[in-house]
């Protein structure tokens, strides 16, 4: 099976549990003879350096210029569509929550729920925080959901 991972968490995190989870998952799937590729055209993540050659496609930046992370995410979404389509995966695993799908919309998709903190304790977050809404949109679009916490 060919499994593609998108750019989202690798654009957002330099180090972190979510990106480490996806790197370890990719390693384990590859060790079990699955074809795995992570597509993150521009990213700042350090965990991807631990992956075997060919599993990761992208360029690492030390950091994004101030106030440009959202621009890099939009750019990555557009630029990764072509390479994901050409690689022709069987499944795309979106690495975080977003309003729009990553990769071709006709592919089956998997989303991982990392926790339910925003839903359990909404009073702890700003009313402007859109995390719960993006999570709901992502889950509605998913064909399969993995819950890890």
Report each predicted region and the residues it spans.
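Carbohydrate transferase catalytic cores enriched for Leloir-type hexosyltransferases
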Residues: 1-149
């Amino acid at each position: 099976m060919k499994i593609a991972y998108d750019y989202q968490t690798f654009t957002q995190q330099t180090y972190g549990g979510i990106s480490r989870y996806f790197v370890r998952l990719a390693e384990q799937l590859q060790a079990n003879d699955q074809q795995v590729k992570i597509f993150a055209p521009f990213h700042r993540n350090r965990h991807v350096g631990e992956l075997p050659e060919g599993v990761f496609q992208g360029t690492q930046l030390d950091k994004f210029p101030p106030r440009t992370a959202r621009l890099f995410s939009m750019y990555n979404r557009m630029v990764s569509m072509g390479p994901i389509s050409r690689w022709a995966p069987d499944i795309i695993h979106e690495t975080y929550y977003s309003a729009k799908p990553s990769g071709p919309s006709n592919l089956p998709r998997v989303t991982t729920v990392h926790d339910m903190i925003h839903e359990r304790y909404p009073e702890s977050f700003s009313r402007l925080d859109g995390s719960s809404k993006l999570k709901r949109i992502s889950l509605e679009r998913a064909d399969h959901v993995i819950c890890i916490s």
